[in-house]
Swiss-Prot record:
It is a multi-pass membrane protein. Keywords: Chloroplast, Membrane, Plastid, Plastid inner membrane, Protein transport, Transmembrane, Transmembrane helix, Transport. InterPro entries: TIC214. This is Protein TIC 214. The gene is TIC214. Belongs to the TIC214 family.
Length: 1450
């Protein structure tokens, strides 16, 4: 038997090994692919994470099961086509799933309480089923609507060439299960770490997790909307010959229409003859083909594929051409590389020569250049014999023709190019032009009485007039100056002379061009301050921080003279009012107004309009009420492309803040110094905070905050686009509530009551339903009449108010009519879009009473009664039986006791009477006769009483026999037992409640005390274990205590410690002596060491204490300095602990073993343990510093600090640094990086050889009407607010030209360029050669040298320049080999090249993509023989059967 069993095992193992070895790579690869499918996190994974961290284990397990079943369904869709049609194809179910995701988000928002986030432990709970359904639905979502990476990973698995193999499929399934279970275990570990490591209670942390998951879910819900972001009724236009109704098509086909244009459509002009055609005029759109068509083989048949990849077709043509031309042979192989090299070098030389000849023609033949330039790139338009305007020829790739567009010169370039010279000074002027990109020149030129910037040249006439005005002012001032002030007179006369000289030079054309900076340089440096004083304007005002603009407008013509700081900063009011740019008032209702259709700035929205009639005039005045909300959303101008419209996402409709993309083009941030009144606003806030106490008026503040939030929401959603949707939904919600929702609820409620054999409540429900009525209000909440609708409610918005809102009750409680009449109040609320109710519009939500809570209460009561009733009946029956038996025994015992008591009484009487017998013998005989007579009387009376009792008993028995029919013994007993049981039940209930409560309280107290006691014991045992290990080291420490001084002095302070340490030579060690040396140096500088203690003064004490880091005063001194309350409490504490061990007049009692520290409390067990801990710490600190021999002595003389100090020493602690920027607004902080870049750039300009200097810029003030700002940096990039409206300045084409100037313009001579071209033509391409003659008329910002050559030549020249032809030829080219061994040598050489060169250049991410990521592996090339996924059509997911390699046609 043993041999047969062993042979069986051997055969089984060999067969198993054979089975494993064959499909081993497939199994491993399947496990790898299965594990990769679990790596990406989808929507359902987020649901599982949320349920595990918040709702507990059961709900997370259910969600996890839903995730796995969803993945199985996705696999089924790949392998089984009916499931593919059911799930993946766009149907109504998938659209409903998107709506379900929004409902899921809304459900998460409502779960904000602890009760909602409580863990559901039972499997029957509804939340567990919801969690399963959520994860299952989100896993099955269509990848068209919501991109799921798991589905694409599964597609890669299916497209593997061995996907039909069973071993691969099983191993893939096992790998996916392993990955999912690892994911679930990781979630359990994260939950455990949260519970253990968090400083917050876990229920509080649940709320934080739930709040952080809600925005993630909302973003995921918005992904399908972002994919189909175009809005049909806004962007789509009606096609020719198409019906205006969209009901002709099926509804899903409208959304998923393949013919619907999602890309820019070709644009052509109707009038092609006009050369100066503007792209925004007379445009029309036509739909054309968007895909690449190609023949392909599908299932053996040639078919046209519209999803055929264009890259594959190009590759096919290249392969066919290369195989036709290329032919290998042994003779041609040797000269292959050399021929190719010679050919490319000759081609490179030809291109370089061509470029050089064209550059030479630029300098020599000007007319040829313009002709050539006009034919190739565009045309020039002449204006006064100067080429100022240029029309560029733009090649549209989508059109097979060229169109000419006029390119305007950038408004960012304020100065003309002809003024720039090739000298060094011109180069710095060009650098300054970079600052001009932040200033709108168009605004400054159009504004009245505005001044040109510093870098522009001044006009001669304006300059002469300005100088004459200055001369008059100077002459007037010379009259007022006294004769004694010779210096000022000389300065004034010198200024007048310089002005006269400049006027004469300008008049005789000696000075042709001059700037304002050059004009200031003419004056002497000493005269500038006096010049500023003399050139002040007639109307002056100084700029203050707390400037009131309302008063400024009222007192426009008055004079103000105030000072801000040391210097006067002047401001002219009239010039400010002149420079204000008036905004245009749009007349929306006037038909003759023509708007600018080119710009994308929207007009201000009008809320309402009204007409005002004037008494004595026929005409009316139209009054417009504009909306408060701003709309900076870019408008779609006429003829805009589809690509421009497609980028208008739905969530970008509400960019009303400064963070909108509109301001990215013209955003200019201000520093904190630029923002007016910021400092004072902060002070006002702090001032008002002091009036509000933290304890009072809390409810008042909360109400104010809620009201502010409500007003903010009202202001935020006051938009026409929102009002259209919201008002329609509100009206639909009201109709749905009144006529659908509530009647259905009433019907089902009464039907269920009838099924449960309860009376129906139709009349009450319908009467309450009729009492609910609706009032339509304006958007602000102002009410209207009952049946009145507001005007233009779609555009202006609407609110719906509910009066006596109806909510369903399970039953009605009967109350008296009077109480209802007294307590009756009209309830009001406002309806929301989601169907809920609010107290005020956008206010607090009202929670309606739930329908199921009273039902649950009643059901729980009935269940409890049913459970406890049989137990109570058994208890009653047992008590009754016990009472019966007990009563019988008790009656018998009572009778016996009564009989015994009677007999005992009689015997006692007899005994007493016998004891009363007279002992005298004489009297006995005389009294016997009396006793006999007395006994006879007793017997007679007893007989009489007995007869009476018998008669009474007989009468009683007769009465009982007569009334047997009325009362029975059983009934009497039953009544007695019932009363007894009721009393017992009450007592038992009270006893149970009290007993359980007391037991719980006692157990809680015991558990708390035990835990405290256990923690104390554990802590002390650990300390004992540590201290026992250090006992030996502590004993060794005692041997070193002889060197230490005795510090048991009662009046101990820092100075005494330093003195004793110096005496005993302890501070020899470097580490100990580090801080001491610093103090000693400072003490030597103060010269206090040699002074006697008697001669020391208070100032000496201060100097000494300032040089020492810290000072710890003595106990006596501290006792005097401390406050009374603290002192008394400390003294009482010391007296209670150890009264005998401490006295202020005597020294402290200290044990012999401890000579270092004094203690003032009793010696307990805990105190002893603390002492040991302290000793160990002291030993560990001093162990490194025990080499204390041969130390220096008397480094510091004795100082006694026992005398009291009257002067306090203060230190700067906890003083807030106000220079630190706090509470910075998010709008400014977000753009900080741009502001810092600009600052660095401007600093670099102002450093070297620049004309703009601080003094010079400051001295320019009298020539220009502007604010006087001392910091030139702020003024240089100060941006006018109204220039935001100059939108044309910030277009993309003009910004591109500005960037080209910064990169490409370098004024180099043509000879240098020719030399560079001969050496390396790449450097020549980066610069444009311009001589002094051509620079005057040539528009250099339009082209580069690359434009002179064709596009193909440019690419070819760049590639040829990048190649290095000087390298030696590879080894595999030099060797003559046979065709058979050619592949071997090539493979070896390629391996060596790859190992040396390419692997070093590969990044880590590329290695991960090649070897770990599934979509980048080589096996995915085999996917093409099964399916080809379309990459061109990005809006849809399409598959098509293709071959792996296309047929190459000869």
């Amino acid at each position: 038997m043993i041999t047969t069993y062993s042979t069986f095992l051997f055969n089984f193992l060999s067969q198993f090994q054979y089975l494993v070895n064959i499909p081993e790579p497939l199994i491993l690869f399947g496990l790898y692919y299965g594990f990769l499918t679990t790596l990406p996190i989808s929507f359902s994974h987020i649901v599982v994470i949320r349920n595990r961290l918040i709702e507990g284990k059961t709900s997370s397990v259910m969600a996890f099961c839903g995730l796995i079943t969803g993945q199985l369904c996705m696999i089924g869709t790949i392998y089984y086509t009916p499931l593919y049609k059911l799930f993946i194809k766009p149907h109504l179910i998938l659209l409903l799933s998107i709506i379900y995701s929004f409902f899921y988000w809304q459900r998460l928002r409502n779960n904000q309480n602890y009760d909602d986030l409580r863990e559901a432990q039972s499997l029957i709970n509804v939340r567990n089923f919801f969690s399963f359904f959520d994860s299952f639905v989100f896993q099955i979502l269509n990848p068209i609507l919501l991109p799921t990476p798991i589905f694409f990973r599964l597609n890669n698995v299916f497209l593997f060439r061995y996907s039909n193999n069973l071993n691969f499929f099983l191993s893939f399934f096992i790998g996916s299960l392993i990955g999912n279970f690892l994911f679930f275990n990781a979630l359990n570990w994260i939950r455990y770490r949260f519970e253990q490591d968090s400083n917050v209670i876990y229920p509080v942390l649940k709320l934080l997790i739930n709040k952080s998951i809600i925005p993630i879910v909302f973003c995921i819900c918005l992904i399908p909307i972002a994919k189909y972001s175009h809005i049909p009724f806004c962007t789509m236009k009606q096609k020719e010959g198409q019906s205006s109704y969209s009901f002709d098509k099926n509804w899903p086909n409208i959304i998923f229409d393949s013919n619907q244009p999602h890309r820019p459509i070709r644009i052509f002009s109707e009038t092609k003859t006009d050369d100066n055609l503007n792209i925004n005029d007379n445009l029309s759109k036509k739909q054309t083909s968007q895909f690449f068509f190609k023949e392909c083989i599908s299932d053996g048949n040639v078919r046209i594929s519209y999803t055929y990849p264009s890259t594959l077709a190009n590759f096919q043509t290249d392969l066919s051409s290369s195989f036709q031309d290329f032919s290998l042979s042994e003779q041609s192989f040797d000269n292959l590389y050399s021929n190719w090299k010679l050919e490319k070098l000759s081609r490179k030389d030809n291109l370089n020569n061509l470029l050089l000849t064209k550059i030479k023609l630029l300098n020599n033949k000007k007319e040829w250049f313009y002709k050539h330039f006009q034919n190739k790139f565009g045309t020039f338009i002449k204006d006064d014999n100067n080429y100022n305007k240029f029309v560029k020829k733009s090649n549209d790739v989508r059109l097979k023709q060229s169109s000419k567009i006029q390119i305007k010169k950038s408004k960012l370039l304020t100065s003309d190019i002809r003024d720039i010279s090739t000298t060094q000074s011109g180069f710095y002027d060009l650098k300054k032009n970079k600052l001009k990109s932040f200033i709108s020149q168009k605004f400054k030129m159009n504004s009245n009485n505005s001044t040109l910037p510093v870098w522009n040249h001044l006009n001669k006439q304006l300059l002469q007039n300005e100088l004459k005005r200055i001369k008059k002012q100077l002459q007037d001032k010379t009259k007022n100056i006294k004769e004694n002030d010779f210096n000022n007179l000389k300065l004034l006369k010198s200024n007048i002379e310089t002005i006269d000289n400049t006027i004469n030079d300008i008049h005789h054309n000696k000075i042709k061009q001059i700037t304002s900076v050059d004009l200031i340089k003419i004056f002497a440096t000493n005269n500038k301050t006096l010049l500023l004083e003399t050139l002040a304007f007639n109307k002056k005002i100084t700029q203050k921080d707390n400037f009131n603009f309302n008063k400024l407008f009222q007192h426009k013509n008055k004079k103000f003279t105030t000072n801000s700081g040391n210097e006067n900063t002047y401001l002219n009011l009239n010039d400010i009012f002149k420079n204000i740019k008036r905004l245009p008032k749009w007349r929306t209702f006037s038909k003759h107004v023509v708007y600018d259709e080119v710009s994308d700035i929207r007009r201000r929205a009008i809320k309402s309009n009204s007409k005002l009639k004037i008494a004595n005039k026929d005409s009316d005045i139209i009054i417009f009420e504009y909306k408060k909300s701003l709309n900076f959303r870019a408008r779609l101008p006429k003829g805009s492309l589809r690509a421009r419209r497609k980028n208008k996402f739905t969530w970008k409709l509400f960019h009303n803040n400064l963070n909108s993309p509109f301001f990215i083009r013209s955003k200019q941030l201000l520093n904190k110094t630029d923002i007016p009144f910021l400092k004072y606003n902060e002070n006002y806030l702090n001032f008002f905070k002091n009036f509000i106490s933290p304890d009072k008026n809390i409810n008042y503040l909360n109400n104010d905050i809620s009201e502010m939030r409500r007003q903010e929401l009202l202001f935020k959603w006051d938009k026409t686009n929102v009002h259209i949707l919201r008002s329609m939904v509100l009206v639909g919600q009201a109709f749905f509530r009144k006529y659908i929702k509530l009647p259905i609820f009433i019907f089902f409620k009464n039907l269920s009551r009838q099924l449960l054999y309860q009376p129906s409540e139709w009349t009450k429900d319908w009467s309450n339903w009729m009492n609910e009525w609706y009032i339509f209000c304006y958007y602000d909440g102002t009410e209207l009449a009952k049946d009145q609708w507001p005007e233009m409610w779609l555009q202006r918005g609407i609110q719906i108010k509910l009066i006596n809102p109806f909510y369903i009750k399970p039953w009605y409680i009967q109350k008296s009519f009077i109480k209802n009449k007294q307590n009756k109040k009209t309830r009001t609320s406002y309806l929301t879009v989601f169907g809920s109710q609010q107290e005020l519009p956008f206010g607090k939500k009202i929670r309606m009473p739930s329908f199921w809570k009273p039902v649950r209460r009643e059901v729980s009561k009935s269940i409890k009664l049913k459970l406890y009733f049989p137990f109570l009946t058994l208890q009653k029956n047992t008590i009754i039986l016990f009472e019966k038996v007990f009563n019988k025994k008790r009656i018998n015992e009572d009778n016996k006791t009564i009989e015994k008591s009677i007999l005992n009484k009689k015997n006692e009487q007899l005994i007493l009477k016998k004891d009363e017998v007279i002992p005298n013998n004489k009297s006995i005989a005389g009294k016997l006769s009396k006793l006999d007579f007395h006994n006879q009387n007793i017997t007679k009376t007893s007989i009489k009483n007995a007869t009476k009792q018998i008669l009474i008993k007989n009468e009683y028995n007769s009465l009982l026999k007569e009334n047997k029919n009325l009362f029975t013994k059983n009934k009497i007993v039953f009544l007695k037992i019932k009363n007894i049981l009721n009393k017992l039940n009450l007592k038992l209930i009270k006893v149970k409640i009290n007993f359980t409560y007391k037991i719980k309280t006692v157990l809680k107290i015991i558990s708390r005390n035990l835990l405290k006691f256990y923690s104390i014991i554990q802590f002390q045992l650990e300390n004992l274990g540590r201290n026992n290990s250090n006992d030996l080291s502590y004993k060794n420490q005692l041997s070193y205590q002889k060197d230490f001084p005795n510090f048991n002095n009662f009046c101990l302070n820092q100075a005494n410690i330093i003195q004793n340490l110096c005496k005993n030579n302890i501070l020899k060690h470097k580490k100990l002596n580090q801080n001491f040396q610093i103090n000693s140096k400072n003490l030597n500088q103060t010269n206090i060491i040699d002074v006697n203690p008697e001669n020391i003064k208070a100032q000496d004490f201060k100097n000494l204490l300032e040089n020492i880091y810290t000072f710890t005063p003595t106990i006596n001194l501290w006792d005097k300095l401390s406050t009374n309350n603290w002192k008394i409490s400390v003294q009482n504490n010391w007296k209670q602990k150890s009264y005998n061990n401490y006295d202020l007049t005597k020294k402290a009692l200290v044990s012999k073993n401890l000579n270092f520290i004094s203690y003032f409390y009793q010696n307990n067990l805990i105190n002893n343990l603390n002492k040991k801990i302290k000793h160990t710490k002291i030993f560990n600190l001093s162990k490194n510093y025990l080499s204390l021999n041969n130390l220096n002595q008397n480094q510091i003389k004795n100082f006694d600090f026992q005398n009291s100090l009257n002067n306090n020493i203060t230190y700067k602690k906890n003083i807030k640094n106000f220079t630190i920027r706090q509470n910075v607004p998010s709008q400014l902080r977000r753009w900080d990086w741009k502001n810092n870049k600009i600052k660095k750039f401007v600093n670099r300009l102002l450093q070297k050889n620049t004309i703009l200097l601080k003094e010079e810029v400051f001295n320019l003030i009298p020539f220009f009407d502007r604010f006087t700002i001392q910091n030139p940096m702020i003024r240089n990039w100060s941006h006018p607010i109204s220039s935001i409206l100059d939108d044309e300045i910030f277009t993309y084409e003009l910004l591109d030209t500005f960037l080209q100037i910064n990169k490409n313009i370098d004024f180099l001579h043509t000879k240098q360029i020719e030399d560079n071209l001969s050496s390396n033509s790449n450097q020549a391409i980066a610069s444009l050669p311009l001589s002094s003659t051509t620079a005057e008329n040539f528009l250099y910002y339009l082209t580069t040298v690359e434009d002179l050559i064709s596009i193909e030549d440019k690419k070819e020249l760049k590639i040829l320049n990048s190649l290095n032809f000087n390298k030696s030829t590879p080894n595999y080219i030099k060797t003559n080999v046979v065709e058979k061994s050619l592949n071997e040598n090539l493979s070896k050489n390629l391996q060596s090249i790859l190992s040396k060169e390419t692997l070093d250049s590969i990044n880590n991410t590329q290695i991960l993509k090649k070897f770990l990521w599934a979509s980048y592996r080589c096996e995915d090339l085999a996917c093409m023989n099964r399916f080809w996924f379309s990459t061109n059509n990005g809006s849809r997911f399409g598959t098509l059967r293709l071959r792996l390699y296309p047929n190459l046609k000869n």
